[in-house]
Design a protein with these regions (language model features):
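Conserved anion-binding
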Residues: 108-212
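N-terminal active-site wall of soluble small-molecule enzyme domains
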Residues: 64-66, 70-132, 222
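A C-terminal functional module that forms or caps the active site or interfaces directly
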Residues: 217-256
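Active-site-proximal loop/turn and secondary-structure-junction residues that shape catalytic pockets
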Residues: 22-24, 72-76, 106-108, 143-145, ...
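Conserved, mostly hydrophobic/aromatic
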Residues: 18, 68, 103, 139, ...
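N-terminal glycine-rich anion-binding loop in soluble enzyme alpha/beta folds
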Residues: 1-60
Length: 256
């Protein structure tokens, strides 16, 4: 899947991902009104508004961009109807040949981690049959629990030709409370970056690994260091725009 992402970035000349993080207050009134007229002011009505809003964004961008990134919490808050909207969004984006990055930030161990990986990237066994569920192409994951939390995802990625973006240095202001803590004279995020690079070396596409990293745009100097630490890992860079990241600040995150 990393090869497809690289190819689509080159084809579109757009190293960007469109976040599909719908908030009801941002959805145009005519979309919300139509959904509420049909389903009422219900969870189903909210989910329909979200789905139609996402569909409009995808229809107007799919030939300009390589990927979309739906944030699952924005859907989960509306319960099962919200997750239906998430599922419809993922499937529609894939119909349009977009790469889908599920921004799910899962982090657990053992069978629980394996279940998360199966639900988002793999296939679940039901009797003699297997079923794909949300079926995103990539997922974001939290490495705080170590290899026990990451390996089940890597196993599914290898089997299903999928990929990961592992949180290394996040864009939020308080990320330094833990991520910048020094261990043997080096910040924790560098140690995490080294581990991502090691995992990545063992799981390569043509030129880059399908084990990528999340490094916030709000910390370009740290991004510069981490680019060198993880030369073969694609970096997902949140925080551009509203959070303060700038175009000039993004340069260190690129190899070329």
């Amino acid at each position: 899947m990393i090869n497809k992402l690289v190819d689509k970035i080159k084809k579109t000349n757009a190293p960007v991902v469109v976040g599909l993080d719908p908030m009801m207050s941002y959805i145009p009134e005519h979309i919300t009104k139509k959904a509420f007229d049909e389903f009422g002011e219900t969870l189903e009505g909210a989910a329909e508004a979200i789905w139609q809003y996402n569909k409009g964004i995808i229809d107007n961008t799919y030939d300009l961009i390589p990927a979309v990134k739906p944030q699952i919490a924005m859907y989960e808050q509306f319960g099962v109807p919200g997750l239906v909207a998430f599922d419809k969004t993922v499937k529609y984006a894939k119909e349009k040949d977009l790469v889908v990055i599920g921004d799910v930030k899962r982090g657990d161990i053992g069978s629980t981690s394996a279940a998360y990986a199966t639900g988002h990237l793999g296939k679940v066994q039901v009797g003699s049959k297997k079923y794909s569920l949300f079926d995103e192409d990539f997922a974001t994951v939290n490495p705080y629990l170590g290899t026990d939390g990451i390996k089940p995802f890597i196993d599914v990625c290898k089997e299903e030709n999928k990929g990961l973006f592992i949180l290394v240095k996040t864009s939020n202001p308080s990320s330094g409370e833990f991520q910048d803590r020094l261990i043997d004279g080096r910040p924790l995020y560098e140690w995490v970056g080294e581990k991502v690079a090691k995992w990545g070396e063992e799981h390569m596409g043509n030129d880059y690994s399908y084990i990528g990293a999340v490094v916030g745009a709000t910390y370009p100097e740290m991004g510069k260091v981490l680019r060198k630490v993880m030369p073969k890992s694609y970096i997902l860079v949140p925080g551009y725009g509203a959070q303060g990241g700038t175009a000039d600040g993004l340069k260190p995150y690129f190899n070329e």
